[in-house]
Amino acid sequence: SMTARYKHTIIDRMLQSPLRFATLPAWTTAVMGDFDRFLLDHATAEKKASGMAISMLSHYPDRTDLVTAMADLAIEELTHYREVLKWIHQRGLITTPDQKDPYVGAFRQSLRQGSEVYFLDRLLTASIIEARGAERFALVAEALEPGPLKKFYLSLARSEARHFELFLELAQKYLDHDMIAQRWDELLDIEADIVATLPIRAALH
């Protein structure tokens, strides 16, 4: 049907992103093979994303557009957390203590010292992390049977794709465009290497 085709086109669009290493089919297989574990990790990731937005607006209180955008983002990510919680509780699961995210930890190593480059790196790594989330939620949506859970993951893929654009727009608002382009290129390579070398598990990263 027309709608089915349209929805599929949206998924295709989500999967086309700036990322330089495509998530392997083995990742989707691992997630679908232990979906409970994936959900628990996913909840933690949403909660941390909300915390990250709050940390950004606390760090840069004088950048009005950023503060407003991060306040909205913190609420949106926490709403996603609340929605994932519903799926978790519906399955009779209990949330688990936070664990370090090896992907985010490795990517954060690339943040440089110095207020301007640090600000740039925070915005660009956040953007790339959102792009990876959009790609992976779209893969999950594609693998799930038609129904509310599939719809949920499709909506998350859309929202992560919006956030990926948001962080890039904020960078363009506050920083030199040549500087952005050069660093964007470097960070995309760094992120691709991280994803290529990390072990595959039933987790967002």
Predicted features by range, described:
Residues R5-H205:
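Non-heme di-metal
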